Amino acid sequence: MRAGSREARLVAALHVPAALSLLGIVRPGDRLVAFADDFADAFACGFDACDVVMVGGPSVAAFAAASEGFDASFDAEGPHLWWFVNSIGGFGLRVPDLRALGRAARVTHALLVVDNTVASIFGCDPLRLGAVLSLEALDRVCAGDAPRKLVAASVARSQLKRHRVDAAAECAHALLEGRGLASLDLSSDEVKVLEHGLDSLGARMQAHFDRARALAEYLAANEMVRSVRYPELTSHPDHAIATGILEHGFGPAVEFDLMDCSAGEFFSMLPDEFRTSPAGGATTRLSAPRGKRASTIRLFAGTDDPLVVAATLDTALRN
């Protein structure tokens, strides 16, 4: 929980869109505008009575265009307009300008929700930047050891300087309070995992970030890799934005395209642990965000030795 949040709740859910649905604050008659092109299927259920609009980019212009004609309100009765982005996410690991989106959302009477899972509370503070609600799947916080999938939801403070009130944040708080949700009952094992994870979070996340940076630099220099997306690289479309949005580095994820083989073929040449290790754990993990027949790989750096990881990847790339 960030010091700047008004309250935080835990939800048992597979991922952030599922948690947002379970919170019940996006209601029938609302419009939900989302940029999550690598996770669009997650919005296909759970928001059936809402007008869900998927946009092709994280820009203010895209969200504003998708919001036209909707008469939104910050009153508890609604209807409400929701804007959903990831602090790092989408194909290409995009980094939206959360400050600009936060300002534009308030002008449009929209409620900005940020999935902060990839960056984590260590790497980004969406509430400080303009979001009214920040949600984060806790796989990495729990170091991959949680008995079940948990998502934390933090609500922004509505009291601003000079006794001003942020109507958007107050609306989000009122909606959540109105649901009257009971606190999630955690087992003793879950409490221990969370406490240990939070105690060690800073050091572990810095290790994830540092290793991602090293692996991104290795991949960018590898002749067997077609292209690399990592927010620190100047070739990334959001590099300039990311320097002012992200903290302690540029996140734990790197995306790259293979030159001469598919993701499925590449995985077959690697040890199984790259695919089967727990999400958020110490072992570097790979996925195929566009499917195994495509050539795109997404890498989440663990805390393992990046030289060993790079050597293993290099062997597979050259086979």
Language-model features, listed with the residues they occupy:
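Conserved PLP-enzyme active-site core in the AAT-like
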Residues: 2-222
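Conserved C-terminal alpha-helix-loop-beta "cap" of PLP-dependent enzymes
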Residues: 224-301, 308-311
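Generic recognition of short, well-ordered alpha-helical segments
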Residues: 96, 311-312
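N-terminal glycine-rich, Lys/His-bearing helix-loop that initiates the first secondary-structure elements
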Residues: 1, 294, 315
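C-terminal alpha-helix
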Residues: 312, 316-319
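Conserved residues at beta->alpha junctions
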Residues: 13, 300-303
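Generic structural motif
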Residues: 16, 127, 156-158, 233, ...
